[in-house]
């Protein structure tokens, strides 16, 4: 599958198989995020791989009670160092940088025949990941799972 095929094929998936995602595939997906461009190559993101069912349920609660979040075997919680770095246009860098990295990850997952779903509705005040990376803010995240194709 080439990148254009992955773009055409990728869609939001909210029903998952309970089959675990192999570490090798997860590492490929995380590497795709790591290789994403960022403002001044700051790489302000931190990715937390969540497999623990209780933590996934807390993430689901923090994601406006979207229960499907807790049903996936893996959630990649995207966190960002929020030091206030701003582009010349006045926009904070981290939301754009994290979004680019997550998009790279969703396309890599699609190539591996895994389903993903962006989770943008999120209440950071609930702090479902403990401990989370120091001074990091939890940002939109993705769910990762085998899906029914």
Question: Where do the model's predicted regions map?
Answer:
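Specificity-determining recognition surfaces
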Residues: 1-25, 147-149
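Small-aliphatic-rich amphipathic alpha-helix that forms the alpha element of a beta-alpha
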Residues: 33, 76, 88-130
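Short secondary-structure transition/capping segments
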Residues: 54, 128-133
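A glycine-rich helix N-cap at a beta->alpha junction
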Residues: 67-72, 133-149
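Glycine/small-residue-rich phosphate/adenosyl-binding loop
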Residues: 25, 31, 35-101
């Amino acid at each position: 599958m080439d990148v254009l095929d992955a773009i055409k094929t990728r869609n939001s998936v909210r029903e998952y198989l309970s089959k675990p995602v192999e570490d090798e595939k997860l590492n490929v997906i995380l590497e795709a995020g790591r290789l994403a461009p960022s403002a001044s190559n700051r790489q302000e993101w931190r990715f937390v791989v969540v497999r623990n069912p209780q933590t996934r349920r807390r993430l689901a609660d923090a994601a406006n009670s979207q229960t499907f979040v807790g049903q996936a075997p893996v959630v990649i919680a995207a966190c960002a160092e929020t030091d206030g770095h701003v582009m010349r246009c006045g926009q904070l860098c981290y939301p754009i940088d994290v979004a680019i990295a997550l998009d790279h990850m969703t396309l890599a997952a699609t190539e591996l025949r895994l389903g993903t779903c962006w989770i943008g509705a999120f209440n950071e005040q609930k702090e479902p990941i403990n401990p989370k990376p120091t001074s990091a803010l939890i940002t939109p995240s993705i769910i990762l799972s085998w899906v029914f194709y």
